[in-house]
UniProtKB/Swiss-Prot annotation:
Name of the protein in question: Methylenetetrahydrofolate--tRNA-(uracil-5-)-methyltransferase TrmFO
Catalytic activity: uridine(54) in tRNA + (6R)-5,10-methylene-5,6,7,8-tetrahydrofolate + NADH + H(+) = 5-methyluridine(54) in tRNA + (6S)-5,6,7,8-tetrahydrofolate + NAD(+); uridine(54) in tRNA + (6R)-5,10-methylene-5,6,7,8-tetrahydrofolate + NADPH + H(+) = 5-methyluridine(54) in tRNA + (6S)-5,6,7,8-tetrahydrofolate + NADP(+)
Keywords tagged on the record: Cytoplasm, FAD, Flavoprotein, Methyltransferase, NAD, NADP, Transferase, tRNA processing
Protein family membership: Belongs to the MnmG family. TrmFO subfamily.
Gene that encodes the chain: trmFO
Bridged cysteine pairs (disulfide): none
Length: 448
């Protein structure tokens, strides 16, 4: 397919990702047609017609450079992010986090985009994928059915599905490897799972804690969709004391290795129950808890799941969530610049690409918008270094294992590891990663 010769770029959706994409394109001197259906057609979750509205929390999370999202925000500031700039201008006290006056922030983003001389705001619902120009689609996690069908068809009838559950993800370096063993069920294929065995006593205590743990409240627009997807582990536990033993905690085919010295029930060769951990990224630094999709409160997840042998001191880089979302099979469908592999004139941004969180959504819009503009100008694509947060996040969502791909927040586990001996002190290690990231980003920008 040849590159579009249109004199403008379309951006569909004026949430965080779409607003950022539109600004990044316009600041490079390219006219933008920015489509937003709110004002013509309401959504269940939005309260206003303002751009970049924050639907749930008003927090952009941690602001320290020893926090991955804090690093991402600093990188975005250096890249002239409209979301970060207006967030700073409408900041409210929140300790070490960055929180904003929800209404003031959204109004200021809206005003800046509506008053930009190169941005034409069109309040209308888009039900077809435009073919008149380079287009960035950033329609959010609840994309309308009509447009979702078109995206589904564009991708060959595959790769755009409803996301109902995500299991927690753990930093491998915080797992007590002396209590787990590597094995695949029935020894099929290579040993690919870390197995956390439980005795009957351990399982009974875990089951009791899980069934009595406090669940997170549901948003009104999620309630009717809650049980359409995978069953939460806590719901499964409440259906019967042995239900999980025939599901994600099934021990069959996961016998103890010969050198196992941990607790066991008598001379049994197989544990009473097993929790499996599956590698979540190519680097092998992250593992998810297989089958443990959940809607427990985050504090409860930490308390209950740290009862699993080997996870007593585990650090969770993402807690499990339950809600309906639309997201793409980005590893198969998108390049590292969020460009469609099937249609080079088409870019996607926001939560539909598999990034999770306000800041991450805006960052994806920055990457997609920047590269849509570079395509328009027939310039080489800009892929940020994997040593940066804004480079590692697109790399993760477009290179993850497609079969097990789930949305992801930015975290240090997906950023390229430091060279040389591992820095044992976590704070010092994160400071070193952040320092390298900002230096590499500055070098990247200086080379343009």
């Amino acid at each position: 397919m040849s590159q579009s010769t249109a004199t403008y770029i379309n951006v569909i959706g004026a949430g965080l990702a779409g607003s950022e994409a539109a600004y990044q394109i316009a600041k490079r001197g390219i006219p933008v047609k920015l489509y937003e259906m709110r004002g013509v057609k309401a959504t269940p979750q939005h309260k206003t017609t303002n751009f970049a509205e924050l639907v749930c929390s008003n927090s952009f999370r941690g602001d320290s450079l020893t926090n991955a999202v804090g690093l991402l925000k600093e990188e975005m500031r250096r890249l002239d992010s409209i979301i970060m700039r207006n967030g700073e201008a409408n900041r409210v006290p929140a300790g070490g986090a960055m929180a904003v006056d929800r209404e003031g922030y959204a109004k200021s983003v809206t005003a800046e985009l509506e008053n930009h001389p190169l941005i034409e705001v069109i309040r209308d619902e888009i039900t077809e994928i435009p073919d008149d120009a380079i287009t960035v689609i950033a329609t959010g996690p609840l994309t309308s059915d009509a447009l979702a069908e078109k995206i589904h068809a564009l991708n060959g009838g595959d790769g755009f599905y409803f996301y109902d559950a995500a299991a927690p993800i753990i930093d491998k370096s915080t797992i007590d490897m002396s209590k787990v063993y590597l094995k695949s069920r029935y020894d099929k294929g290579e040993a690919a799972y870390l197995n956390c065995p439980m005795t009957k006593e351990e399982f009974m205590a875990f089951h009791d804690a899980l069934t009595n743990a406090e669940e997170a409240p549901l948003n009104a627009f999620e309630k009717e969709k809650y049980f359409e997807g995978c069953m939460p582990i806590e719901v499964m536990a409440k259906r019967g004391i042995k239900t999980m033993l025939y599901g994600p905690m099934k021990p069959v085919g996961l016998e103890y290795p010969d050198d196992y010295t941990g607790p066991r029930d008598g001379e049994f060769k197989t544990p009473y129950a097993v929790v499996q951990l599956r590698q979540d990224n190519a680097a092998g630094s992250l593992y998810n808890i297989v089958g443990f999709q959940t809607h427990l409160k985050w504090g409860e997840q930490k308390r209950v799941f740290q009862m699993i042998p080997g996870l007593e001191n585990a650090e969770f880089v993402r807690y499990g969530v339950m809600h309906r979302n639309s997201y793409m099979d980005s590893p198969n469908l998108l390049t590292e610049t969020f460009q469609s592999r099937n249609n080079p004139n088409l870019f996607f941004a926001g939560q539909m690409t598999g990034v999770e969180g306000y800041v991450e959504s805006a960052a994806s819009g920055l990457v997609a918008g920047t590269n849509a503009a570079r395509l328009f100008k027939r310039e080489e694509a800009l892929v940020f270094p994997q040593t940066t947060a804004i480079g590692s996040l697109p790399h993760y969502v477009t290179h993850a294992d497609s079969k097990h791909f789930q949305p992801m927040n930015v975290n240090f586990g997906i950023i390229k590891e430091l060279e040389g001996p591992r820095i044992r002190d976590k704070k010092e290690r994160y400071e070193a990663i952040a320092s390298r990231a900002l230096a590499d980003l500055d070098t990247c920008l200086a080379s343009l």
